[in-house]
């Protein structure tokens, strides 16, 4: 008669691959037959087989037995009883959670390929491959053998003619440009016509220098002035001076005498110490695949242009370290801040797959570029863009923006030695309106001071700048600055739909003062016979909690509100979001914050006014159902987020979203809200676990890395996962614990992850087997279940799969299935889904 060991499974994740291997290893040290019996399921399995153990569907809390019979049953009984009591409960540690505080590492599917990497700082994301092509930086001092002077009169005449030609050439290029290109050419036109530059050039030739010598001397003079500035913005303008001066050399002496460096004839990743905007514009964009710069910041005109053309760009690059790979194929990875040199075939295939996925995503999103945002039940909610400069407007509207919900004008005041004048601001707003083509732009007046210091205003540093002297609170002291901005906005309003929005309003006194100044600015323009929109709308940021309690009074004086969710969160919850010690308290899913939002939206709508939201919260897809439930009139977000937001909104029913919001406001903790949202995502679409679009047949993937990357990419394209690399990392974490190869050329990679939107069983049938741990696999069934899924669904499905795969008939049916639909149907039937 068999000896019996009775025990309860205390493993939090049940018996999966790792603990099963421990049981299997220990049981195989005995000759006796040992059977595992799960009393809950009444399933039995050979304890010397990990696959059979998994098939018993043993979960946490299950009552189980080991039945032992054979020559050494006494010894086995004693040893296994002790092990099950003392060691078994501790043989499966939970997987460590990945923290996102630090820079995320490279994807595991890439690092496993052992690529040779050089890191740099990303200023424009994306990835591409091409020939590493050096571009000579524009060093006027290295030109050498400058032409000699032919007399003062001749040089002055040549200089005057050259300056005229430069201006005409820039104006000609402006006729065929728009967006960022237009704005930067305008900056160059301003430089070429600059009085100080002209005077310095003329002084040089009057002193006997040739035009070339005077141009180089003038460039050095102004570049030295800029380089002494503590402002990175001004330092980067030195490149524009050299650019315009080189254009002047070319106009006077010809391009043969001073040829522009860099002509592209093949797909290229260009590298340079620095690149002028004109050099960038001259590069053939059909061949330019990436840009590597030794110097250049986020405000560099070249970097701004690269962004507008969606060229992956890295700065801070060690150019000398790249010299050995000139004229060789490399890859730029702007998503990871990496340059990959000497790529082997596997690395090349990795980036080819990246390119295919990005092309597919762009094709998916194309339909949303021109469609208005609506919920599934037809409720209209405008999706607008946040921008900080007119150069961003064209790309935003091209990405599907229905308006600009936030034009942050403070960026126009920062990193310079003096405030922009009325004409400069007017031109910037007009450029943005040109791209808008009749669509609305909400201009937020300068939110400077406090945490956004401007040197020339001499606002002293503060202990708590978020609560200090900033935004509307500085306007009275700097009234002329505020009036200048109001005048520029009003003048531009004659050319399109502009609205004015005031930041940091906390009282009626501030609103009334602003309206007084706005009325004065309007009267000035009337007296000067300058046209503007007499009915221009005035709104305020709803970011200081006190405003929520005077909404009725505010509505008597203003036209609209826009919720600044970032600041409102920190003010309402008393959290400095830049203080790492209290960051965990900064959570816009706090039920108190959600209640505050709902109160504000309903109060505004009762007064018949418009209210939008322009904080970071608007771009979070997971929170979108709550924002729809609030009944907001508009959501404003970063431009790249717009197509996906429209697509997600089209799947939401506003009535269901309202019910969800009510449930969220009834929660007691942020964690409960997160769990509620996760459950809503899983049930909203009622998406089946198995679907043909997540099944690929005869895949050409040649390694485990390609399989996991490809299958998670498919989940992204199917709309079931927004962060495929994070989901992939969770799968690799499981693989690091124990390989999920099951034998029979089958593997079942699996994970419970917060990065899967809809729990999914994916399938890949490969053309040829790939190495999977110590075995090979050709048929992959990937199980990805949402971390917040209720119950033990993950282990139940895994257990059923393991049991079925032990049967040859089931394996053959999967391997020989004629279509993805046939595989989906078979899995649904066999797994009782």
Curated annotation (Swiss-Prot):
Q: Name one Pfam family in it.
A: PTS-HPr
Cofactor list: Mg(2+)
Indicate the principal place this protein occupies in or around the cell. Answer: cytoplasm
| Leading EC class | transferase
Xref: CDD domains: PTS-HPr_like, PTS_IIA_fru
**Could you name the active-site residues?**
16 (tele-phosphohistidine intermediate), 301 (tele-phosphohistidine intermediate), 614 (proton donor), 750 (tele-phosphohistidine intermediate)
Phosphohistidine modified-residue sites: 16, 301, 750
Q: Which parts of the sequence belong to the HPr domain?
A: 2-91
Which GO molecular function annotation, any one, does this entry have?
A: phosphoenolpyruvate-protein phosphotransferase activity
Q: Which UniProt keywords apply?
A: Cytoplasm, Kinase, Magnesium, Metal-binding, Phosphoprotein, Phosphotransferase system, Sugar transport, Transferase, Transport
Question: In which domain of life is the source organism classified?
Answer: Bacteria
Query: Which biological process terms from the Gene Ontology are attached to this UniProt entry?
Result: fructose import across plasma membrane; N-acetylglucosamine transport; phosphoenolpyruvate-dependent sugar phosphotransferase system
| Residues at which phosphoenolpyruvate binds | 408, 444, 566-567, 577
- Location relative to the cell: Cytoplasm
Instruction: Quote the SUPFAM superfamilies the UniProt record gives.
Output: Enzyme I of the PEP:sugar phosphotransferase system HPr-binding (sub)domain (SSF47831), HPr-like (SSF55594), Phoshotransferase/anion transport protein (SSF55804), Phosphoenolpyruvate/pyruvate domain (SSF51621), Phosphohistidine domain (SSF52009)
Q: Residues that bind Mg(2+), according to the entry?
A: 543, 567
Q: Identify its protein family.
A: Belongs to the PEP-utilizing enzyme family.
Record remark: domains: The PTS EIIA type-2 domain is phosphorylated by phospho-HPr on a histidyl residue. Then, it transfers the phosphoryl group to the PTS EIIB type-2 domain. In contrast to classical PTS systems, the fructose-like PTS has no requirement for HPr and Enzyme I; PtsA combines a IIA domain with an Enzyme I and a HPr domains.
Role: Multifunctional protein that includes general (non sugar-specific) and sugar-specific components of the phosphoenolpyruvate-dependent sugar phosphotransferase system (sugar PTS). This major carbohydrate active transport system catalyzes the phosphorylation of incoming sugar substrates concomitantly with their translocation across the cell membrane. The enzyme II FrwABC PTS system is involved in fructose transport.
Q: What is this protein called?
A: Multiphosphoryl transfer protein 2
Native organism is Escherichia coli (strain K12)
């Amino acid at each position: 008669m068999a000896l019996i060991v009775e025990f309860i499974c205390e493993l939090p994740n049940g018996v999966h691959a790792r603990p099963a291997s421990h049981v299997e290893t220990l049981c195989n040290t005995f000759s006796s037959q040992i059977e595992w019996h799960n009393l809950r399921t009444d399933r039995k399995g050979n304890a010397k087989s990990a696959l059979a153990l998994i098939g018993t569907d043993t979960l946490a809390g299950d009552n189980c037995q080991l039945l032992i019979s054979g020559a050494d049953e006494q010894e086995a009984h004693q040893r296994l009883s002790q092990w099950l009591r003392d060691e078994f409960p501790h043989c499966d540690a939970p997987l460590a959670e990945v923290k996102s505080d630090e820079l995320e590492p490279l994807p595991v599917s890439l690092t496993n390929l052992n690529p040779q990497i050089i890191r740099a700082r990303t200023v424009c994301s994306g990835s591409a491959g091409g020939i590493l092509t050096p571009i000579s930086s524009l060093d006027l001092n290295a030109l050498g053998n400058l032409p000699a002077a032919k007399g003062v009169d001749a040089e002055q005449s040549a200089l005057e003619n050259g300056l005229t030609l430069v201006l005409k050439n820039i104006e000609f290029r402006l006729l065929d440009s728009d967006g960022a290109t237009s704005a930067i050419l305008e900056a160059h036109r301003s430089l070429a016509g600059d009085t100080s530059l002209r005077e310095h050039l003329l002084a040089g030739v009057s002193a006997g220098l040739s035009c070339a010598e005077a141009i180089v001397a003038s460039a050095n003079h102004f570049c030295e002035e800029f380089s002494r500035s503590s402002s990175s913005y001004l330092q980067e303008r030195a490149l524009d001076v050299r650019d315009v001066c080189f254009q002047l050399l070319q106009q006077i002496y010809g391009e043969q005498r001073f040829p522009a460096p860099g002509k592209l004839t093949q797909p290229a990743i260009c590298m340079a110490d620095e690149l002028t905007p004109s050099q960038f514009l001259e590069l053939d964009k059909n061949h330019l695949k990436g840009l590597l710069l030794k110097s250049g910041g986020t405000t560099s005109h070249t970097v701004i242009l690269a962004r507008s053309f969606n060229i992956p760009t890295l700065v801070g690059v060690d150019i000398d370290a790249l010299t050995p790979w000139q004229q060789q194929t490399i890859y730029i990875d702007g998503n990871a801040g990496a340059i990959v040199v000497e790529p082997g075939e596997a690395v090349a295939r990795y980036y080819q797959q990246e390119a295919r996925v990005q092309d597919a995503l762009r094709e998916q999103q194309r339909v949303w570029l021109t469609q208005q945002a609506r919920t599934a039940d037809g409720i209209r909610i405008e999706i607008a863009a946040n921008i900080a400069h007119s150069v961003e407007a064209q790309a935003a509207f091209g990405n599907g923006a229905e308006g600009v919900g936030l034009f942050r004008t403070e960026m126009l005041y920062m990193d310079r030695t003096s405030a922009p004048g009325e004409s400069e601001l007017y031109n910037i707003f007009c450029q943005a309106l040109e791209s808008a083509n009749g669509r609305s732009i909400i201009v937020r007046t300068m939110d400077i001071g406090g945490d956004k210091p401007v040197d020339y205003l001499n606002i002293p540093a503060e202990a708590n700048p978020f609560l200090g002297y900033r935004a509307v609170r500085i306007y009275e002291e700097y009234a002329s600055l505020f009036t200048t901005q109001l005048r520029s906005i009003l003048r531009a309003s004659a050319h399109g739909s502009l609205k004015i929005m005031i930041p940091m309003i906390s009282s009626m006194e501030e609103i009334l003062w602003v309206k007084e100044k706005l009325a004065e600015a309007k009267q000035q323009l009337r007296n000067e016979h300058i046209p503007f929109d007499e009915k221009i709308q005035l709104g305020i940021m709803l970011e200081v909690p006190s405003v929520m309690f005077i909404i009725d009074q505010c509505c008597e004086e203003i036209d609209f509100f826009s919720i600044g969710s970032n600041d409102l969160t920190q003010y309402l919850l008393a959290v400095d979001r830049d203080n790492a010690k209290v960051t965990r308290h900064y959570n816009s899913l706090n039920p108190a914050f959600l209640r505050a939002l709902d109160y504000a939206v309903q109060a505004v709508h009762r007064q018949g006014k418009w209210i939008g939201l322009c904080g970071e919260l608007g771009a979070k897809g997971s929170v979108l159902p709550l924002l729809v439930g609030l009944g907001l009139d508009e959501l404003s977000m970063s431009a790249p987020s717009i197509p996906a937001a429209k697509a997600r909104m089209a799947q939401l029913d506003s009535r269901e979203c309202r019910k969800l919001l009510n449930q969220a406001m009834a929660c007691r903790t942020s964690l409960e809200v997160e769990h509620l949202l996760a459950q809503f995502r899983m049930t909203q679409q009622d998406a089946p676990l198995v679907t043909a679009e997540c099944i690929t047949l005869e895949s050409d993937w040649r390694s485990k890395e390609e399989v996991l990357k490809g299958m998670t990419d498919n989940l992204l394209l199917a709309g079931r996962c927004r962060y495929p690399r994070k989901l992939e990392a969770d799968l690799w974490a499981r693989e690091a614990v124990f390989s999920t190869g099951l034998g029979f050329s089958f593997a079942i990679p699996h994970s419970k992850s917060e990065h899967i939107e809809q729990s999914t069983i994916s399938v890949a049938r490969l053309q040829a087997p790939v190495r999977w741990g110590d075995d090979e696999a050709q048929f992959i069934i990937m199980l990805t279940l949402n971390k917040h899924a209720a119950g033990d669904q993950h282990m139940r499905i895994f257990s059923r799969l393991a049991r079925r795969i032990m049967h040859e008939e089931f394996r053959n049916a999967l391997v020989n299935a004629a279509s993805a639909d046939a595989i989906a149907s078979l899995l649904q039937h066999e797994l009782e889904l």
